[in-house]
Amino acid sequence: MSSIQSIQSRIKTVQSIRKITHAMELVSYSKLKKAKTAFDEVEKYNLLIDQTFNKIFENISHDDLKELMKSRNNSKSKLYIIVTSNLGLAGAYNANVIKLVKETVTSDDYLIIIGSYGVRALRQQYNEQIINLSDITTSKRTSTLVSKIIKRAFKYYRNGAVSSINFIYTKFINNLVQEELCEKVFPFDEQMIREHIDRKEIDYKLEFEPSAKDVLADAIPLFVDSKLHLAMATSLISEHSARRSAMENATRNSDSLITELDMEFKRKRQAKITNEIIEIVSGADAV
C-alpha cells in the first residue's frame, strides 16, 4: 500500500496538473468565442458568394452549365484537401479526421494537408501522394494560404492529374458534437446546381460581361476558395470546442482523483495514529 508521503506527493502532482488543464480550458473557451465570431464573418461572405452564384446559374443555359461542370478528364485520382490542427490535446478531433482520411483516400489520390498534426500523422503513409503541406496560420495570413492552395488544386485539375477536388474537415454542430466530413466541392454535381437554381433569395438583377458562362468559368476558383475558408473556420471552432471539452473533462477527473487520494490519505493517517495509540497502550500495559 502507498505510504502517506507518496499519497501527499501524488495529490500535489494532480493539483499541479489540474491547474494546467483548468487554465487550458479557460484559454480554449476564449479562443472558441473568437473563432465563432470569425466564423460568422466567413459565413456572411459565403452567403454573398452563394447568392451571386445562384444568380449566375439562373442566367446560364443548361448545356453551357453542363459543359463547364463536367469532369475534364478520366483520371482515377482525386485531390483531397485535409484540415487538421497544429496542436493536439483536443480529444478525438484530429484522430477522427485522420481515420476518415485512411478510410477514404486510395493510393491513386493526392493530398494537400493543412495543420502540422495532420502532417505528422499522415506524412509517412502518404508521402508520395502529398503535394502540399501547410501549418494553420494566423487569420491575417489565412487568405494567402487558401489562395495558394486553391491555385495549386486547380492546376492539378486542369492538367488532368485529378478528376475532382474534395475537402476532409470537421463541421461544428454544437459544443458537444462535431462531425468529420468528406465533401466534393468541384466539379459541381447536378443536385448541387439544382439546389442553387431553386433558391429565390435574390430579388435584384445582375448583368454579365461578356456572358454568364464566361463569368462563371473565371469565378469557379473564387467559389471553391470561399468554401475552403468556411471549412477551415468551422474546423477551428470544432478544434477549440473539442479541446475545451477535453480540458474540462481532465479538470473534472483531476478533482475526482484528488478527492479519492485525500480520502485515502486521511484513512492512512487515521490508521497510523490508531496504531501509535495501540503501541503506547500496549507499552504501558507491559510496564
Curated annotation (Swiss-Prot):
Q: Does the keyword Ligase feature in the UniProt annotation? A: no
Q: Where is the signal peptide?
A: none
Q: Which UniProt keywords apply?
A: ATP synthesis, Cell membrane, CF(1), Hydrogen ion transport, Ion transport, Membrane, Transport
Query: What GO molecular function annotation could you give as one example from this UniProt entry?
Result: proton-transporting ATP synthase activity, rotational mechanism
**InterPro entries to which the protein is assigned, alphabetical:** ATP_synth_F1_ATPase_gsu, ATP_synth_F1_gsu, ATP_synth_F1_gsu_CS
A Pfam family that this protein carries is ATP-synt
Function of the protein: Produces ATP from ADP in the presence of a proton gradient across the membrane. The gamma chain is believed to be important in regulating ATPase activity and the flow of protons through the CF(0) complex.
UniProt xrefs under PANTHER family: ATP SYNTHASE GAMMA CHAIN, ATP SYNTHASE SUBUNIT GAMMA, MITOCHONDRIAL
Its protein name is ATP synthase gamma chain
Q: Which organism is it from?
A: Mycoplasmopsis agalactiae (strain NCTC 10123 / CIP 59.7 / PG2)
